[in-house]
């Protein structure tokens, strides 16, 4: 199960998804001296997207005997990771726009570590899908030799 490289990639992807839930995506220092932050846990849809990503990655690890289903779930998970990436940047922009519309000036703002984790997620899931595909090709070639 964990002996296969794609299982390791899926486990790392689940860890990256969990880290995305733990850390802030964006922090801003406001002109009135306070700070505000956006994290995935505070937005319901973003939280659900990351939970789905984590569950699909962990579920994919245990589907090692059903490689075609594992491959499809991993591709589907990549789509969820793209959706999470796009939606988290939308949430950050909406938060910044609400602050500015509310008359609060942002003196400095920066994306945090967790905002780049969906990119790592996509890469890890792609590597896992590639490993699953190679496994499937290897099994088919061995079946032809029998």
Predicted regions mapped to residue ranges:
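Cytosolic juxtamembrane helix at the C-terminal end of the final transmembrane segment
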Residues: 126-146
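C-terminal TM-helix exit segments that contain a strictly Trp-centered aromatic cap at the helix terminus
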Residues: 19-24, 83-95
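Individual transmembrane alpha-helices with interfacial aromatic-anchor signatures
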Residues: 6, 43, 105-127
């Amino acid at each position: 199960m964990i002996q296969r490289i794609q299982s390791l990639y899926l486990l790392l992807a689940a860890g990256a998804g969990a880290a995305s839930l733990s850390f802030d995506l964006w922090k801003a220092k406001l002109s009135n001296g306070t700070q505000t932050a956006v994290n995935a846990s505070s937005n319901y849809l973003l939280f659900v997207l990351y939970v789905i990503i984590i569950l699909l990655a962990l579920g994919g690890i245990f589907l090692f005997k059903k490689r075609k289903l594992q491959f499809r779930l991993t591709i589907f998970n990549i789509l969820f990771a793209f959706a999470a990436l796009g939606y988290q940047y939308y949430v950050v922009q909406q938060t910044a726009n609400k602050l500015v519309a509310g008359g609060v000036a942002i003196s400095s703002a920066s994306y945090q570590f967790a905002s780049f984790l969906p990119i790592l997620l996509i890469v890890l899931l792609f590597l896992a899908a590639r490993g699953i595909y190679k496994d499937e090709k290897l099994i088919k070639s061995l079946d032809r030799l029998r």
